[in-house]
Amino acid sequence: MAVLLETTLGDVVIDLYTEERPRACLNFLKLCKIKYYNYCLIHNVQRDFIIQTGDPTGTGRGGESIFGQLYGDQASFFEAEKVPRIKHKKKGTVSMVNNGSDQHGSQFLITTGENLDYLDGVHTVFGEVTEGMDIVKKINETFVDKDFVPYQDIRINHTVILDDPFDDPPDLLIPDRSPEPTKEQLDSGRIGADEEIDDFKGRSAEEVEEIKAEKEAKTQAILLEMVGDLPDADIKPPENVLFVCKLNPVTTDEDLEIIFSRFGPIRSCEVIRDWKTGESLCYAFIEFEKEEDCEKAFFKMDNVLIDDRRIHVDFSQSVAKVKWKGKGGKYTKSDFKEYEKEQDKPANLVLKEKVKPKQDAKYDLILDEQGEDSKSSHSHTSKKHKKKTRHCSEEKEDEEYMPIKNPNQDIYREMGFGHYEEEESCWEKQKNEKRDRRQNRSRSRSRERDGHYSNSHKPKYQTEPYERERSRKRDRSRSPKKSKAKEKSKYR
Protein backbone atom coordinates (compact mmCIF):
# COMPACT_ATOMS: atom_id res chain seq x y z
CA MET A 1 0.00 0.00 0.00
CA ALA A 2 2.53 2.58 -1.18
CA VAL A 3 3.10 4.95 -4.08
CA LEU A 4 6.35 6.41 -5.50
CA LEU A 5 6.21 10.01 -6.76
CA GLU A 6 9.00 10.97 -9.18
CA THR A 7 9.48 14.75 -8.98
CA THR A 8 11.89 17.09 -10.73
CA LEU A 9 13.89 17.31 -7.47
CA GLY A 10 13.81 13.62 -6.48
CA ASP A 11 11.66 10.65 -5.46
CA VAL A 12 9.17 10.56 -2.59
CA VAL A 13 7.51 7.37 -1.22
CA ILE A 14 4.06 7.63 0.41
CA ASP A 15 2.54 4.88 2.58
CA LEU A 16 -1.28 4.81 2.59
CA TYR A 17 -3.74 4.19 5.45
CA THR A 18 -5.94 1.81 3.46
CA GLU A 19 -7.79 0.43 6.50
CA GLU A 20 -8.59 3.79 8.12
CA ARG A 21 -9.26 5.71 4.85
CA PRO A 22 -10.30 3.14 2.22
CA ARG A 23 -12.21 5.52 -0.05
CA ALA A 24 -9.52 8.23 -0.10
CA CYS A 25 -6.79 5.62 -0.70
CA LEU A 26 -8.82 4.01 -3.53
CA ASN A 27 -9.24 7.41 -5.18
CA PHE A 28 -5.52 8.25 -4.88
CA LEU A 29 -4.29 4.85 -6.11
CA LYS A 30 -6.55 4.72 -9.16
CA LEU A 31 -5.68 8.32 -10.15
CA CYS A 32 -2.00 7.34 -9.99
CA LYS A 33 -2.78 4.24 -12.06
CA ILE A 34 -4.35 6.21 -14.93
CA LYS A 35 -1.34 8.68 -14.80
CA TYR A 36 -3.59 11.54 -13.75
CA TYR A 37 -0.83 13.20 -11.68
CA ASN A 38 1.84 13.12 -14.38
CA TYR A 39 3.35 16.61 -14.99
CA CYS A 40 1.22 18.20 -12.28
CA LEU A 41 2.76 21.37 -10.85
CA ILE A 42 3.43 21.83 -7.17
CA HIS A 43 1.48 25.10 -7.14
CA ASN A 44 1.49 26.03 -3.42
CA VAL A 45 4.58 25.93 -1.19
CA GLN A 46 4.22 27.59 2.23
CA ARG A 47 7.45 27.18 4.17
CA ASP A 48 7.16 25.04 7.31
CA PHE A 49 3.47 24.54 6.60
CA ILE A 50 2.34 22.63 3.50
CA ILE A 51 3.20 21.56 -0.05
CA GLN A 52 0.10 21.34 -2.26
CA THR A 53 -0.29 19.63 -5.65
CA GLY A 54 -2.61 17.34 -7.61
CA ASP A 55 -4.27 19.91 -9.90
CA PRO A 56 -3.63 19.29 -13.62
CA THR A 57 -4.45 22.95 -14.39
CA GLY A 58 -1.79 24.20 -11.95
CA THR A 59 -4.11 26.91 -10.58
CA GLY A 60 -5.35 25.22 -7.40
CA ARG A 61 -8.98 25.36 -8.59
CA GLY A 62 -9.13 22.24 -10.74
CA GLY A 63 -9.00 18.47 -10.48
CA GLU A 64 -11.60 15.72 -9.99
CA SER A 65 -11.78 12.35 -8.28
CA ILE A 66 -11.58 8.94 -9.93
CA PHE A 67 -15.36 8.67 -9.59
CA GLY A 68 -15.75 11.71 -11.83
CA GLN A 69 -13.64 9.92 -14.43
CA LEU A 70 -15.92 6.88 -14.17
CA TYR A 71 -19.41 8.33 -13.65
CA GLY A 72 -19.28 11.89 -14.97
CA ASP A 73 -19.29 15.39 -13.54
CA GLN A 74 -21.93 14.64 -10.89
CA ALA A 75 -19.37 12.39 -9.16
CA SER A 76 -16.37 14.74 -9.44
CA PHE A 77 -16.04 14.89 -5.64
CA PHE A 78 -16.64 12.38 -2.86
CA GLU A 79 -17.53 12.79 0.80
CA ALA A 80 -14.74 13.20 3.36
CA GLU A 81 -13.99 10.34 5.75
CA LYS A 82 -13.78 11.74 9.29
CA VAL A 83 -13.83 8.51 11.33
CA PRO A 84 -11.45 7.48 12.79
CA ARG A 85 -9.91 10.87 13.42
CA ILE A 86 -6.25 11.17 12.38
CA LYS A 87 -4.37 14.35 13.30
CA HIS A 88 -1.68 16.34 11.50
CA LYS A 89 0.96 15.77 14.19
CA LYS A 90 4.21 15.27 12.27
CA LYS A 91 6.00 16.37 9.14
CA GLY A 92 5.28 14.39 6.00
CA THR A 93 1.58 13.79 6.71
CA VAL A 94 -0.40 13.40 3.45
CA SER A 95 -4.01 14.66 3.28
CA MET A 96 -6.73 15.13 0.69
CA VAL A 97 -7.59 18.82 0.23
CA ASN A 98 -11.09 19.95 1.19
CA ASN A 99 -12.91 21.79 -1.61
CA GLY A 100 -14.88 23.92 0.87
CA SER A 101 -17.93 21.66 1.22
CA ASP A 102 -16.33 18.68 3.03
CA GLN A 103 -15.64 16.93 -0.28
CA HIS A 104 -12.43 15.83 -1.99
CA GLY A 105 -11.25 15.64 -5.58
CA SER A 106 -7.69 14.99 -6.75
CA GLN A 107 -5.64 17.62 -4.87
CA PHE A 108 -3.55 16.56 -1.88
CA LEU A 109 -1.01 18.17 0.43
CA ILE A 110 2.11 17.17 2.37
CA THR A 111 2.75 18.90 5.69
CA THR A 112 6.18 20.43 6.39
CA GLY A 113 5.38 21.49 9.96
CA GLU A 114 4.45 19.74 13.19
CA ASN A 115 1.26 19.86 15.28
CA LEU A 116 -0.91 21.60 12.68
CA ASP A 117 -4.08 21.24 14.73
CA TYR A 118 -6.08 23.73 12.63
CA LEU A 119 -5.96 21.28 9.70
CA ASP A 120 -7.60 18.52 11.77
CA GLY A 121 -11.21 17.83 10.81
CA VAL A 122 -10.88 19.89 7.61
CA HIS A 123 -8.51 17.90 5.42
CA THR A 124 -8.56 14.09 5.49
CA VAL A 125 -5.29 12.36 6.40
CA PHE A 126 -4.77 9.20 4.32
CA GLY A 127 -1.00 8.57 4.36
CA GLU A 128 2.51 9.71 5.27
CA VAL A 129 5.90 10.15 3.61
CA THR A 130 8.23 7.29 4.57
CA GLU A 131 11.10 7.96 2.15
CA GLY A 132 12.36 11.13 0.52
CA MET A 133 11.95 13.61 3.37
CA ASP A 134 15.12 15.32 2.12
CA ILE A 135 13.30 16.02 -1.17
CA VAL A 136 10.33 17.38 0.78
CA LYS A 137 12.76 19.65 2.64
CA LYS A 138 14.21 20.92 -0.67
CA ILE A 139 10.74 21.73 -1.96
CA ASN A 140 9.94 23.46 1.33
CA GLU A 141 12.97 25.78 0.95
CA THR A 142 12.29 26.81 -2.65
CA PHE A 143 11.77 30.48 -3.51
CA VAL A 144 8.15 31.52 -4.07
CA ASP A 145 6.23 34.68 -4.96
CA LYS A 146 3.60 36.47 -2.86
CA ASP A 147 1.00 33.83 -3.85
CA PHE A 148 3.33 31.00 -2.70
CA VAL A 149 3.89 29.79 -6.26
CA PRO A 150 7.51 28.67 -6.88
CA TYR A 151 9.51 30.79 -9.32
CA GLN A 152 10.92 27.64 -10.89
CA ASP A 153 8.58 24.83 -11.85
CA ILE A 154 8.53 21.75 -9.61
CA ARG A 155 6.53 18.91 -11.16
CA ILE A 156 5.47 15.32 -10.57
CA ASN A 157 6.97 13.61 -13.61
CA HIS A 158 5.69 10.11 -12.95
CA THR A 159 3.82 7.96 -10.40
CA VAL A 160 4.58 4.32 -9.63
CA ILE A 161 2.21 2.10 -7.57
CA LEU A 162 4.25 -0.16 -5.33
CA ASP A 163 1.27 -2.02 -3.76
CA ASP A 164 -2.46 -1.81 -4.58
CA PRO A 165 -4.92 -3.84 -2.45
CA PHE A 166 -8.02 -2.56 -4.31
CA ASP A 167 -9.53 -4.10 -7.43
CA ASP A 168 -9.83 -1.93 -10.51
CA PRO A 169 -13.35 -0.70 -11.40
CA PRO A 170 -14.71 -2.32 -14.58
CA ASP A 171 -14.81 0.89 -16.66
CA LEU A 172 -11.36 2.16 -15.61
CA LEU A 173 -9.17 3.02 -18.62
CA ILE A 174 -5.51 2.33 -17.82
CA PRO A 175 -2.99 3.69 -20.40
CA ASP A 176 -0.26 1.36 -21.70
CA ARG A 177 2.46 3.95 -21.11
CA SER A 178 2.85 7.41 -19.68
CA PRO A 179 1.35 10.10 -21.93
CA GLU A 180 3.50 12.89 -23.34
CA PRO A 181 2.96 16.35 -21.79
CA THR A 182 1.19 19.01 -23.83
CA LYS A 183 2.54 22.51 -24.49
CA GLU A 184 -0.14 23.98 -22.22
CA GLN A 185 1.06 21.79 -19.36
CA LEU A 186 4.72 22.75 -19.78
CA ASP A 187 4.12 26.47 -20.46
CA SER A 188 3.63 27.91 -16.99
CA GLY A 189 5.21 31.29 -17.71
CA ARG A 190 7.96 30.66 -15.17
CA ILE A 191 11.44 29.16 -15.13
CA GLY A 192 11.26 25.67 -16.55
CA ALA A 193 11.94 22.68 -14.35
CA ASP A 194 14.83 21.57 -16.59
CA GLU A 195 16.41 25.02 -16.93
CA GLU A 196 19.68 25.61 -15.09
CA ILE A 197 20.15 28.90 -13.29
CA ASP A 198 23.88 29.59 -13.38
CA ASP A 199 25.09 33.20 -13.45
CA PHE A 200 28.74 32.13 -13.66
CA LYS A 201 28.39 29.83 -16.64
CA GLY A 202 31.08 30.58 -19.27
CA ARG A 203 33.04 32.96 -16.99
CA SER A 204 36.58 32.61 -15.73
CA ALA A 205 37.46 32.16 -12.07
CA GLU A 206 38.71 35.78 -11.82
CA GLU A 207 35.47 37.17 -13.21
CA VAL A 208 33.47 35.02 -10.81
CA GLU A 209 35.50 36.35 -7.88
CA GLU A 210 34.97 39.94 -9.02
CA ILE A 211 31.21 39.43 -9.30
CA LYS A 212 31.08 37.85 -5.85
CA ALA A 213 33.14 40.70 -4.37
CA GLU A 214 30.80 43.30 -5.93
CA LYS A 215 27.74 41.51 -4.56
CA GLU A 216 29.31 41.27 -1.11
CA ALA A 217 30.24 44.97 -1.15
CA LYS A 218 26.71 45.87 -2.21
CA THR A 219 25.28 43.75 0.59
CA GLN A 220 27.54 45.39 3.16
CA ALA A 221 26.63 48.87 1.88
CA ILE A 222 22.92 48.10 2.22
CA LEU A 223 23.54 46.78 5.72
CA LEU A 224 25.44 49.94 6.70
CA GLU A 225 22.61 52.05 5.30
CA MET A 226 20.10 50.11 7.40
CA VAL A 227 22.24 50.57 10.51
CA GLY A 228 22.61 54.29 9.78
CA ASP A 229 26.35 54.49 9.10
CA LEU A 230 25.80 55.41 5.43
CA PRO A 231 23.38 58.03 4.07
CA ASP A 232 22.68 55.82 1.06
CA ALA A 233 23.85 52.44 -0.20
CA ASP A 234 24.69 53.88 -3.65
CA ILE A 235 26.69 56.82 -2.34
CA LYS A 236 30.32 57.19 -3.44
CA PRO A 237 33.13 58.99 -1.59
CA PRO A 238 34.31 62.30 -3.10
CA GLU A 239 37.16 61.95 -5.60
CA ASN A 240 38.85 65.27 -4.75
CA VAL A 241 39.65 64.47 -1.11
CA LEU A 242 42.89 62.89 0.14
CA PHE A 243 43.34 60.95 3.35
CA VAL A 244 46.73 61.56 5.01
CA CYS A 245 47.81 59.45 7.99
CA LYS A 246 50.92 58.68 10.11
CA LEU A 247 51.36 62.39 10.83
CA ASN A 248 53.53 63.85 13.56
CA PRO A 249 51.37 65.20 16.42
CA VAL A 250 53.06 68.60 16.05
CA THR A 251 51.99 68.96 12.39
CA THR A 252 49.28 71.60 12.02
CA ASP A 253 46.61 72.37 9.43
CA GLU A 254 48.59 75.33 8.09
CA ASP A 255 51.72 73.22 7.58
CA LEU A 256 49.88 70.61 5.52
CA GLU A 257 48.03 73.24 3.51
CA ILE A 258 51.29 74.97 2.58
CA ILE A 259 52.94 71.67 1.56
CA PHE A 260 50.02 70.35 -0.53
CA SER A 261 49.02 73.69 -2.06
CA ARG A 262 51.82 73.41 -4.64
CA PHE A 263 49.68 70.85 -6.51
CA GLY A 264 46.67 73.18 -6.80
CA PRO A 265 44.18 75.29 -4.87
CA ILE A 266 42.86 73.68 -1.68
CA ARG A 267 39.35 74.14 -0.34
CA SER A 268 39.99 72.80 3.13
CA CYS A 269 42.71 71.09 5.13
CA GLU A 270 41.88 69.69 8.55
CA VAL A 271 43.97 67.66 10.97
CA ILE A 272 41.53 65.61 13.03
CA ARG A 273 41.89 66.22 16.76
CA ASP A 274 40.35 64.89 19.93
CA TRP A 275 37.38 67.15 20.61
CA LYS A 276 38.00 67.01 24.38
CA THR A 277 41.78 67.37 24.69
CA GLY A 278 42.51 69.03 21.33
CA GLU A 279 45.42 66.67 20.66
CA SER A 280 46.12 65.52 17.11
CA LEU A 281 44.93 62.05 16.10
CA CYS A 282 47.74 61.94 13.47
CA TYR A 283 45.54 61.90 10.37
CA ALA A 284 43.98 64.57 8.17
CA PHE A 285 41.68 65.21 5.18
CA ILE A 286 42.68 67.56 2.36
CA GLU A 287 40.04 68.69 -0.15
CA PHE A 288 41.22 70.03 -3.53
CA GLU A 289 39.17 72.10 -5.93
CA LYS A 290 40.05 69.84 -8.89
CA GLU A 291 40.29 66.06 -9.13
CA GLU A 292 43.45 66.31 -11.29
CA ASP A 293 45.30 68.17 -8.54
CA CYS A 294 44.17 65.54 -6.05
CA GLU A 295 45.56 62.74 -8.25
CA LYS A 296 48.91 64.54 -8.61
CA ALA A 297 49.24 64.91 -4.86
CA PHE A 298 48.32 61.24 -4.39
CA PHE A 299 51.15 60.05 -6.66
CA LYS A 300 53.76 62.56 -5.45
CA MET A 301 53.23 62.80 -1.69
CA ASP A 302 52.94 59.19 -0.59
CA ASN A 303 55.78 58.16 1.79
CA VAL A 304 57.11 61.74 1.97
CA LEU A 305 58.93 62.89 5.12
CA ILE A 306 57.05 65.63 7.03
CA ASP A 307 58.18 66.65 10.53
CA ASP A 308 60.39 63.53 10.79
CA ARG A 309 57.48 61.22 9.89
CA ARG A 310 56.87 59.18 6.72
CA ILE A 311 53.26 59.93 5.83
CA HIS A 312 50.84 57.72 3.91
CA VAL A 313 48.46 59.26 1.36
CA ASP A 314 45.34 57.63 -0.09
CA PHE A 315 42.01 58.66 -1.56
CA SER A 316 39.41 59.31 1.09
CA GLN A 317 36.67 56.71 1.58
CA SER A 318 34.75 58.78 4.11
CA VAL A 319 31.28 60.11 3.32
CA ALA A 320 30.68 61.67 6.73
CA LYS A 321 30.42 65.23 5.40
CA VAL A 322 28.61 64.40 2.18
CA LYS A 323 25.02 65.59 1.86
CA TRP A 324 22.94 63.08 -0.09
CA LYS A 325 19.14 63.21 -0.52
CA GLY A 326 18.76 65.17 2.68
CA LYS A 327 21.00 62.79 4.60
CA GLY A 328 24.62 62.77 5.70
CA GLY A 329 26.69 65.40 7.45
CA LYS A 330 28.19 64.90 10.90
CA TYR A 331 29.19 67.10 13.81
CA THR A 332 32.65 68.61 13.47
CA LYS A 333 35.22 69.81 15.98
CA SER A 334 33.91 73.38 15.83
CA ASP A 335 30.39 72.19 16.67
CA PHE A 336 31.62 70.52 19.84
CA LYS A 337 33.63 73.61 20.82
CA GLU A 338 30.54 75.82 20.47
CA TYR A 339 28.57 73.37 22.56
CA GLU A 340 31.23 73.47 25.30
CA LYS A 341 31.17 77.29 25.29
CA GLU A 342 27.41 77.29 25.75
CA GLN A 343 27.72 74.88 28.66
CA ASP A 344 30.40 77.03 30.33
CA LYS A 345 28.29 80.20 30.19
CA PRO A 346 26.88 81.27 33.60
CA ALA A 347 23.20 80.77 34.00
CA ASN A 348 20.85 83.77 34.06
CA LEU A 349 19.16 82.54 37.22
CA VAL A 350 20.55 84.03 40.50
CA LEU A 351 19.76 82.86 44.03
CA LYS A 352 18.32 85.58 46.25
CA GLU A 353 19.70 86.16 49.76
CA LYS A 354 16.33 86.81 51.42
CA VAL A 355 12.79 86.01 50.54
CA LYS A 356 10.47 88.99 50.44
CA PRO A 357 7.45 88.69 52.79
CA LYS A 358 4.13 88.42 51.06
CA GLN A 359 2.12 91.64 51.41
CA ASP A 360 -1.32 92.59 50.26
CA ALA A 361 -1.30 95.56 47.93
CA LYS A 362 -4.44 97.01 49.57
CA TYR A 363 -2.86 97.49 53.03
CA ASP A 364 0.08 99.64 54.12
CA LEU A 365 2.14 99.66 57.28
CA ILE A 366 0.32 101.21 60.33
CA LEU A 367 2.03 103.56 62.82
CA ASP A 368 1.60 103.18 66.59
CA GLU A 369 -0.26 106.49 66.92
CA GLN A 370 -2.97 105.29 64.59
CA GLY A 371 -3.52 102.01 66.40
CA GLU A 372 -7.10 102.60 67.53
CA ASP A 373 -8.28 103.98 64.21
CA SER A 374 -6.60 101.15 62.37
CA LYS A 375 -8.49 98.57 64.40
CA SER A 376 -11.86 99.96 63.37
CA SER A 377 -10.80 100.33 59.74
CA HIS A 378 -9.36 96.83 59.74
CA SER A 379 -12.58 95.37 61.14
CA HIS A 380 -14.57 97.29 58.54
CA THR A 381 -12.40 96.05 55.67
CA SER A 382 -12.50 92.51 57.05
CA LYS A 383 -16.30 92.63 56.89
CA LYS A 384 -16.14 93.69 53.28
CA HIS A 385 -13.68 90.92 52.57
CA LYS A 386 -15.96 88.37 54.24
CA LYS A 387 -18.90 89.56 52.19
CA LYS A 388 -16.86 89.18 49.02
CA THR A 389 -15.72 85.69 49.94
CA ARG A 390 -19.29 84.70 50.83
CA HIS A 391 -20.50 85.96 47.48
CA CYS A 392 -17.73 84.03 45.68
CA SER A 393 -18.55 80.87 47.63
CA GLU A 394 -22.21 81.16 46.63
CA GLU A 395 -21.21 81.47 42.99
CA LYS A 396 -18.95 78.43 43.34
CA GLU A 397 -21.78 76.43 44.89
CA ASP A 398 -24.02 77.38 42.00
CA GLU A 399 -21.33 76.22 39.60
CA GLU A 400 -20.82 72.97 41.51
CA TYR A 401 -24.47 72.03 41.29
CA MET A 402 -24.76 72.90 37.64
CA PRO A 403 -25.71 69.80 35.62
CA ILE A 404 -23.36 68.38 32.94
CA LYS A 405 -24.53 69.71 29.63
CA ASN A 406 -25.22 67.17 26.94
CA PRO A 407 -23.45 68.17 23.69
CA ASN A 408 -26.47 66.88 21.72
CA GLN A 409 -28.92 68.98 23.76
CA ASP A 410 -29.35 71.69 21.13
CA ILE A 411 -29.82 69.07 18.41
CA TYR A 412 -32.54 67.29 20.41
CA ARG A 413 -34.28 70.59 21.08
CA GLU A 414 -34.40 71.32 17.32
CA MET A 415 -35.75 67.82 16.63
CA GLY A 416 -38.66 68.45 18.98
CA PHE A 417 -37.71 66.59 22.14
CA GLY A 418 -39.26 68.94 24.72
CA HIS A 419 -38.23 67.18 27.91
CA TYR A 420 -34.87 68.93 27.78
CA GLU A 421 -36.62 72.34 28.01
CA GLU A 422 -38.72 71.14 30.98
CA GLU A 423 -35.62 69.94 32.78
CA GLU A 424 -33.92 73.29 32.19
CA SER A 425 -36.88 75.28 33.56
CA CYS A 426 -37.10 73.06 36.68
CA TRP A 427 -33.41 73.48 37.25
CA GLU A 428 -33.64 77.27 36.97
CA LYS A 429 -36.51 77.39 39.50
CA GLN A 430 -34.56 75.30 42.00
CA LYS A 431 -31.52 77.45 41.48
CA ASN A 432 -33.45 80.72 42.09
CA GLU A 433 -35.10 79.33 45.24
CA LYS A 434 -31.73 78.34 46.70
CA ARG A 435 -30.31 81.77 45.91
CA ASP A 436 -33.24 83.54 47.64
CA ARG A 437 -32.80 81.37 50.73
CA ARG A 438 -29.13 82.21 50.94
CA GLN A 439 -29.79 85.94 50.53
CA ASN A 440 -32.45 85.91 53.29
CA ARG A 441 -30.12 84.10 55.65
CA SER A 442 -27.28 86.49 54.93
CA ARG A 443 -29.55 89.54 55.50
CA SER A 444 -30.84 88.26 58.84
CA ARG A 445 -27.32 87.48 60.01
CA SER A 446 -26.05 90.89 58.96
CA ARG A 447 -28.92 92.63 60.83
CA GLU A 448 -28.21 90.70 64.02
CA ARG A 449 -24.51 91.43 63.69
CA ASP A 450 -25.12 95.16 63.09
CA GLY A 451 -27.41 95.43 66.15
CA HIS A 452 -24.90 93.72 68.38
CA TYR A 453 -22.15 95.93 67.05
CA SER A 454 -24.09 99.17 67.63
CA ASN A 455 -24.95 98.28 71.25
CA SER A 456 -21.47 97.15 72.18
CA HIS A 457 -19.63 100.08 70.57
CA LYS A 458 -21.80 103.04 71.74
CA PRO A 459 -19.79 105.69 73.68
CA LYS A 460 -20.65 106.64 77.26
CA TYR A 461 -21.84 110.14 76.48
CA GLN A 462 -24.48 108.58 74.21
CA THR A 463 -25.71 106.01 76.76
CA GLU A 464 -26.29 108.48 79.67
CA PRO A 465 -29.21 110.47 78.17
CA TYR A 466 -30.74 107.23 77.05
CA GLU A 467 -30.71 105.96 80.64
CA ARG A 468 -32.24 109.25 81.92
CA GLU A 469 -35.12 108.90 79.50
CA ARG A 470 -35.74 105.37 80.65
CA SER A 471 -35.78 106.46 84.30
CA ARG A 472 -38.30 109.21 83.51
CA LYS A 473 -40.57 106.74 81.82
CA ARG A 474 -40.40 104.52 84.84
CA ASP A 475 -41.29 107.46 87.14
CA ARG A 476 -44.29 108.35 85.02
CA SER A 477 -45.54 104.80 85.08
CA ARG A 478 -45.55 104.80 88.92
CA SER A 479 -48.49 106.03 91.05
CA PRO A 480 -48.89 109.83 91.60
CA LYS A 481 -48.93 109.51 95.38
CA LYS A 482 -45.45 108.16 95.56
CA SER A 483 -44.16 110.74 93.14
CA LYS A 484 -45.62 113.61 95.20
CA ALA A 485 -44.10 112.19 98.38
CA LYS A 486 -40.77 112.10 96.62
CA GLU A 487 -41.03 115.72 95.60
CA LYS A 488 -41.90 116.78 99.14
CA SER A 489 -38.93 114.89 100.49
CA LYS A 490 -36.67 116.77 98.09
CA TYR A 491 -37.65 120.22 99.46
CA ARG A 492 -37.47 119.38 103.12
Curated annotation (Swiss-Prot):
Catalytic activity: [protein]-peptidylproline (omega=180) = [protein]-peptidylproline (omega=0)
Alphabetic keyword roster: Isomerase, Isopeptide bond, Nucleus, Phosphoprotein, RNA-binding, Rotamase, Ubl conjugation
Enzyme Commission designation: 5.2.1.8
Biased composition (Basic and acidic residues): 177-187, 426-436
Class of the enzyme per the UniProt entry, highest EC level: isomerase
CDD domains: cyclophilin_RRM (cd01921), RRM_PPIL4 (cd12235)
Record's compositionally biased regions (Basic residues): 377-390, 473-485
Sequence segments annotated as region (Disordered): 167-188, 368-409, 423-492
Domain PPIase cyclophilin-type residue range list: 1-161
GO cellular component: cytosol; nucleoplasm
Family annotation (InterPro entries): CRIP, Cyclophilin-like_dom_sf, Cyclophilin-type_PPIase_dom, Cyclophilin_PPIL4, Nucleotide-bd_a/b_plait_sf, RBD_domain_sf, RRM_dom
Domain RRM as annotated: residue spans: 240-318
Molecular function GO terms recorded: peptidyl-prolyl cis-trans isomerase activity; RNA binding
SMART domains: RRM
Subcellular location, record wording: Nucleus
Residue(s) carrying Phosphoserine: 178, 393, 471
Transmembrane residue ranges: none
Role according to the record: PPIases accelerate the folding of proteins. It catalyzes the cis-trans isomerization of proline imidic peptide bonds in oligopeptides.
UniProt-recorded name of the protein: Peptidyl-prolyl cis-trans isomerase-like 4
Gene symbol of the encoding locus: Ppil4
